Amino acid sequence: MEVPAKIQKRIERLRQEINDHNYRYYVLSQPTIPDSVYDELFHELQKLEKKYPETITPSSPTQRVGAEPLKVFEPVHHEIPMLSLDNVFDEKGLRAFDKRIRQRLKLDKPFEYVCEPKMDGVALSLLYENGELIRAATRGDGYTGENVTQNTRTIASVPLQLRGNDYPELVEIRGEVLMPREGFAKFNREAEKRGDKTFANPRNAASGSLRQLDPRITAKRPLIFYGYLIGLLKGKDFPKNHCDVLKWFKDWGIPVISEIKVVGGIEGCLDYYEHLVKTREKMPFDIDGIVIKVNSLQVQAELGFVSRAPRWAIAYKFPAQEKMTVVKAIEFQVGRTGVVTPVARLEPVSVSGVTVSNATLHNFDELYRKDVRVGDTVIVRRAGDVIPEVVGPILAKRPKKAKLIKIPSRCPVCHAEVIKPEGEAVARCVGGLYCRAQLRESIKHFASRRALDIEGLGDKLVELFIQEKLIKDITGIYQLKKSAITALPRMGEKSAENLLTAIEKSKKTTLPRFLYALGIRGVGDTIARTLARHFHELDLLMKASIETLQEIRDIGPVVAENIHAFFHQKHNAELINKLIHLGVHWPQEKAVVKSEIAGKTFVLTGALKSLTREEAEEKIERSGGKATSSVSKNTDYVIVGENPGSKYEKAKALGISLIDEEAFLKLLKS
């Protein structure tokens, strides 16, 4: 289909506007529109590109996300090695660095240095050809890194196409990938809620995010890139000074740290260092010192390199923000998803101006690796200047009777069994629905759209019901009384009636939805449908052995153990029986009969008229098929609805059968 000239012009205009706003946000730090307006522009572009897929280009802002997961990172040879810097830790060492340079150049007078914050992130090389990003690679050992292009494309601050026209034929931009402190804290909070692994500090988070085999995971991480150096350069001469290189970066749309300063001589470097020592905690990301570079690129070339580091640059590291204290106790906290976390209770100590009396030990693998015990004198650090953590014990000061901490066999809150699956770092309480520590999130999950879908039972109302002790476990939802609800603040009769109607309506559900609502770790809606299709009845599933569960497609040993442990916890069985007694019910799952759908894999793209996406996927699963979210060579059918996305084009390219809604409904009837 030919793209109307007016549409093509609008698409190009949208791309330009979005790229300009990215530039203003990430490079100039001067956003001119609110996020909501930016989102509207982005969604309009997405919609037009879906309708006219032939207009999509690799450098379009919409093409940052969506690549298939990788099996392995390809090695990348650095034509110019990515060397590390030598370090100094005091004024004497810095002055010695300056003296060596001036002696080598036979200069008595001071000359210009460029001072920059030393970012505590992950080094990254970006290669642009004719302005287009063609490759991104990690430092690795300095000579060989890993190709992380697909992941890097998802980082919003990395331009897929350089701005303007005054860029070289080929340029390698080196810099650092960071996770800002605010984004790091938010990521860890959300990971804790989901029961996922948290990161110890922003640097680990940035590194782990950049090295995900699935770019879609990287896309969800709050990463930012700052450029600081040019490696390869073809088709353009180097400028006179390093600060001119940084100006190039800004002109091309590459973010550069604003705290960079050109100083005259080593005294200026020392002043800059003292300034950053005082202001480092106000910065949005972690730094662990300053980097000092000779400003003149000609002088840099004269000085050259020694071993694995340049002679013309040095890192002046900050003193470690660590203190010693004593572990008074090690207690266990239970998270909302049952994760049991060891926490060290400490003799209060001031670290970076903050009194620290508690510090996370992250998980039991970390606890045993560090071998921290009650009574130990330990080194405490504020990880990322924010989260207190125990670095490790000073073994020479360990009391003779200090004992190794054991994983608790029972939950400190509900006294249910605590299990630590082989290969996992975390231990979990299997108390599930009965454990009060997990109650709040369990209720929210139980009422969510893909579960029992109780309209109106939102987060704030759940908090209020628990606070007022109207709900003590999930069964309490079905025992709420109108009089008790209307007695609450801002809850009138109409609101109470609407909520009770929604609760009553939720009693009629399906077995897959009920299984998903129970919140068993590892059992999402797809696994829930698989279990319902396999067992047909809840009783049979509750009696299934771990071995039987492992024989089912898509269920591995860890999920099988989670399911078995959940149903064999007495409290969970009692709560399930009580829910059924209170009226929660579902039609019996029918055994899958032989059909055109059985054994086939389906992907949906676009909107269907007669079914929601969830309903269509449920019908596929109940007919013996499998519904997946991405197109691959293993896909049998792609169901094409209104306004299909890129999956439609990919299916056409792979020669996969495309069917419309009418054909899909006929298959269901077969």
UniProtKB/Swiss-Prot annotation:
Residues 592-670 form the BRCT domain. Belongs to the NAD-dependent DNA ligase family. LigA subfamily. It is an enzyme of class 6 (ligase). Keywords: DNA damage, DNA repair, DNA replication, Ligase, Magnesium, Manganese, Metal-binding, NAD, Zinc. DNA ligase that catalyzes the formation of phosphodiester linkages between 5'-phosphoryl and 3'-hydroxyl groups in double-stranded DNA using NAD as a coenzyme and as the energy source for the reaction. It is essential for DNA replication and repair of damaged DNA. Zn(2+) binds at C411, C414, C429, C435. One of its GO terms (cellular component) is cytosol. Pfam families: BRCT (PF00533), DNA_ligase_aden (PF01653), DNA_ligase_OB (PF03120), DNA_ligase_ZBD (PF03119), HHH_2 (PF12826), HHH_5 (PF14520), Nlig-Ia (PF22745). Its cofactor is Mg(2+); Mn(2+). The active site is at K118 (n6-amp-lysine intermediate). It catalyses: NAD(+) + (deoxyribonucleotide)n-3'-hydroxyl + 5'-phospho-(deoxyribonucleotide)m = (deoxyribonucleotide)n+m + AMP + beta-nicotinamide D-nucleotide. The lineage of its organism: Bacteria, Pseudomonadati, Pseudomonadota, Gammaproteobacteria, Legionellales. This is DNA ligase. One of its GO terms (biological process) is DNA repair. Its EC number is 6.5.1.2. It comes from the Bacteria. HAMAP family: DNA_ligase_A (MF_01588). NAD(+) binds at D35, S36, V37, Y38, D39, S84, L85, E116, R139, E176, K293, K317. GO terms for molecular function: DNA binding; DNA ligase (NAD+) activity; metal ion binding.
